[in-house]
Amino acid sequence: MSECIFCTLPGIKIFLENELSLAFFDKFPVSKGHVLIVTKRHISNIFEATSEEMASIGDLLKKVKEELDKTYHPDGYNVGANTGSTSGQTIFHLHVHVIPRYQGDAGTVRWHT
């Protein structure tokens, strides 16, 4: 089994963190300011997270948004987590994408309800 890149984070500068989770800028951003929030404990997806880990992700999500709003001034956000290879997950360590969106940018993600 290969080592999990989100457990080691080689060469990655931590943007924000709390006791159970941390945030850093995505190495392959969809847009300017794209951040990933990951749990410090290695778990493969959001459904394995404890209530405490979910709360820590929520806490960082708010703090990340505040910082990105100050620096990048986006017009909106996409926030999400892929679970399983069929959904597009390629790194099997829980991570939540926080993707700032800007008026007129390409690649709009739309979920139909």
Residue positions per predicted region:
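HIT superfamily nucleotide-processing domains
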Residues: M1-T113
